[in-house]
Amino acid sequence: MDIATGALLWDVTHDMALRGGPTIIGTELIAVIDMDGRVFVYQLADGTLFWQRTGLPVNTIIYGATSPAFNASELVLAGAGGEVSVHQIQTGDILWTDTLASLLPNTPLESLGDILAHPVHDGRQVYVISQAGRFAAFDAQSGFMAWEHPFAGSQLPWIAGDSVYLVTLTGRLVSLRLSDGMIRWVSKLKGALPEGKAVSDDGPIYLGPIVASGQVLLLSQNGQISRFDAMNGNALGSTSIGGSFDTPPTAASGYFVTLSSSGNLTVMR
């Protein structure tokens, strides 16, 4: 749609519902993923199909999907069955592929293996976390796994400086060093599962994290915003905005933005 007038510029109809994306790639392309895991890349100017690729076939999927990530000439896909792949943006050719499916699942949730957290590409490494209990960093060019930790998550890892921050399905906020994956600190969140307990679908739900001004911010499902020191993980306080939340918060131009399940938009400075 035209941003100034709202006029329809082009549209494309798919034979299956879309579940991932859209991801804008530079100024020329846009990528989406359908329920079958198929990837479609279109030209932004007129909606012409640029290339498409078939996804990994699986018997069971969890509704919802990651959005592709990109950096320079590489497009990162992660999703059903724990599959991770990096493609050449201009051709769709696969550069490398791997999986973060659990080798020894302890629960039905872990056995599904689907990746719900968006992958991250920082130009050097690709970071992906699965709900099956695997968080890994891969060399973006070769696909070599640089390091891995047994963390399960469904939220986008956040990179700030030389650290990556993530929230686990067991209710832990974790900071790691990007270069080698060394754990800097771990903070136990309210409602966290006991140490050693397997991930289940009744664990605490936290959305985020977001890192800004030296603080790590998390939003709980019941509208509690918690703040932590990015250097050491110490709790700095919390604010309740009420409501129920399923959508992760975002940050832009010094503002913290949330959207509740009932459609209420809250903007905080």
What do these predicted regions represent?
Residues 2-5, 43-47, 89-92, 139-142, ...:
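Short loop/turn segments that connect beta-strands within beta-propeller blades
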Residues 34-35, 79-80, 130-131, 168-169, ...:
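Structural signature of WD-repeat beta-propellers
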Residues 29-30, 75, 126, 164, ...:
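Hydrophobic beta-strand positions that form the internal "hydrophobic ladder"
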